[in-house]
Amino acid sequence: MKIPSKFKLFGTTINVVWDNKRLNDQSVYGLYEYSTSEITLSTSQGVKELSKDRIIDTFYHERTHAILDMMNERGLSEDEKFVDVFSKLLRQAIESEEY
């Protein structure tokens, strides 16, 4: 799966950017910011490169935050266990599609 540079939710463009330094300074792999409609991702944790699988999981995790925030479901968006499980199920559903 390729990670998009942007996608839309309710007509709002969500940009996907890469910033290893910023996220390493915050000790996170990814971040969704509602105020800027932006997902920031990292490809490393310190000097260690993240696996492609970890990066894709992180993208789906942050995308789930974006979806829930756009739905005004802040409580669910703040529930990291829910977001983590839901994002993994969403990834599996999309990646296992057959046509």
Ranges and model annotations:
Residues 2-8, 17-40, 49:
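Catalytic zinc-binding patch centered on the HExxH motif and its immediate surroundings
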Residues 19, 69-73:
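Short, function-defining helix-loop hinge/capping sites that tune catalysis or transport
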Residues 35-36, 42-46, 67-70, 86, ...:
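Short, surface-exposed, polar/charged, turn-prone segments marking secondary-structure boundaries
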